[in-house]
Amino acid sequence: PDRLLHSMAQKTVSLVGEAVKRSPTAGIALVTQLTGEHGRQNFDRVTHTKTIESILSSLDEEGLQRYLAYLRDIIYAPTSAAPEDAKGIAMQRQSACDQMLGLVRSHLVQSSSGWVRDVLIFFAGHGYYAVKNPVKGPWSAILQVPTVPFTDALREVCRSRLQACLIELSEPDERGTPWSLAVMDMLDTMEKDHKHFTTTARPIAQERIQRAKSMLHQMRNASKKEKNETRKLHLRAFEILLASVILVTFEDGDDAPDMVDSVVDAAKLLFFDDKASQREMDGMELLTDALIGLLEISSAFLRSMTIQVFSAFSSSMTRDSLNHLVDQLGMGENEDAEDDEIKEDEEDDGDEEEEEEADD
């Protein structure tokens, strides 16, 4: 059947684009048929074409919103799997989440803050919080109580897909806010709404998150008042880093290392210490320690965000902080080891020459 799908897709893909441009509504109908109950959710991968992506690239904002609504319906009320088929439901739901992420990643699909925000709200509302009662207001169509309860595994999928989206979203939203900070605003709204949302974070994670949020709010207030452009850039970069740490900290268990302390301490020294000279020296070294610690954590998301911060602060790093970076990365040790090896080789060569002269 996969070969048949591939053959059919190859013959029709050249005709689909023009047809969808003439009638975007027909495009949505075609997508739902190709990826629905009688098709394949991973149609493009199975057929080795970009049929679905090509159709989606021809849709306007309204069409993309309808496509996302279709994917949410699959997640909230799976139809192609029986209620007792937990594995089938899980696969169907994860595939729909992957398609949402694919939409954000696609370079062919027209990006807009409207539908991108809806994707992030969905992943945030079900990954970092659980919807316990029907939501009212502008989020009511996006966040619903599922007919089959979400598993912890699906919530983990939502968290990882949201983080993957943020790696892709390098440009800010329509208000100029970095998307990671826009997600923080979403989570703050959910945290205050106890009637409809409950957090997925464990008590240890909640305590760490509150410490990080307190510093994040302090930094965002300072950023609004800051006049120096370089310092404002540094504040914004650090806000993004702190937001990223919060998103990963949501998953912390009792044995997880505390990522918050080192980042918060660095922020205090860099931005809120009264002694400017002390701030420059100690703050950059503490920042270096914090960033290296984050790079050691197995998280592609944190790695990506950490590298962004390195880039923002690179021009302001002092000689001491650069030397500290070399020490922390073990680069100096490697060079010393290489020097020792060279000296040993030279000494060995000298010994051999002396032995040869003695023999003569």
Residue ranges, per PLM feature:
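Eukaryotic nuclear macromolecular-assembly scaffolds and interaction domains used across chromosome biology
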Residues: 1-339
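Long acidic, serine-enriched intrinsically disordered low-complexity regions
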Residues: 328-360
